[in-house]
Swiss-Prot record:
Gene: trpD
Organism: Rhodopseudomonas palustris (strain HaA2)
Lineage start: Bacteria, Pseudomonadati, Pseudomonadota, Alphaproteobacteria, Hyphomicrobiales
Biological or metabolic pathway of the protein: Amino-acid biosynthesis; L-tryptophan biosynthesis; L-tryptophan from chorismate: step 2/5
Keyword Glycosyltransferase on entry: yes
An example molecular function term from Gene Ontology annotations: magnesium ion binding
Class of enzymatic activity (EC top level): transferase
Protein name according to UniProt: Anthranilate phosphoribosyltransferase
Amino acid sequence: MIDFKAVIAKVATGASLTRDEAANAFDAMMSGDATPSQMGALLMGLRVRGETVDEITGAVTTMRAKMLTVAAPPDAVDVVGTGGDGSGSVNVSTCTSFVVAGCGVPVAKHGNRALSSKSGAADVLNALGVKIDITPDHVGRCVAEAGIGFMFAPTHHPAMKNVGPTRVELATRTIFNLLGPLSNPAGVKRQMIGVFSRQWVQPLAQVLQNLGSESIWVVHGSDGLDEITLSGPTAVAELKNGEIRTFEIGPEDAGLPRAPADALKGGDAEANAVALRAVLEGMPGPYRDVALLNAAATLIVAGKAKDLKEGVALGAQSIDSGAAEARLKKLIAVSAAA
């Protein structure tokens, strides 16, 4: 049993926790062995000082050890944003996921309801007719039969219930906003992760390097978007062959036009579902372009495309052939089947 008071005292001096100390502290929180005051103190102490790569790695190790897992092929990918970018945009990573699945890459998408926006991945999928509150085995069947499955975070991370009330009361970003995308219940080794702040691009790539991921892009748009943006450059940290490389990309690198950030303004779940379906049905415009751009990056991560332009061409084929929309229809059917 960890001495939680000693952990708080250490953080209060400005010192960093070791990976093991962080893992044990988060185990205490998620097991219900820490009081709400203790949890709030530690979460805010870490937030104010700035969470380290070792602290995040330790916390993720505990999250992963406690989650309910899903069976998925070794080449499965996840496209996920941390959320919390305050943009109120359409659901980019969700749309991107269907485009990628339509290219024949299995997608095991992890997500939740909106925390800060009007429509998170779970909200828009629910509005599209996908059943989201299904068992881990059922999600595995979706990935196997539909080529895409959605893992609703509360179902797969039941231990989070001990931390939930404290997070709600704090009502500000904590380390948990970073942990969700790093704790995919299907254990995917290939991911496209969007983050709400540029300061986290390289550290999250380092965390995933520590945890043995194979192929990762961590991205942050210059306009604040937790995706690759159309309005300007996007910062990228790429993990490949155990090495991390950082660079910037723009839509022109993919042969796509720029568009202002407000061209991607979204609405509630129903409005965003209508917009997403329109993209899968072939409607041109900025939403299609941003989905193609993010799909192109994901296809590079998956080893399907050698560069962004090839990825965009494959993504366009996925939409225009009807393959992407077929993945959505199949997911609706398989998720509804008992």
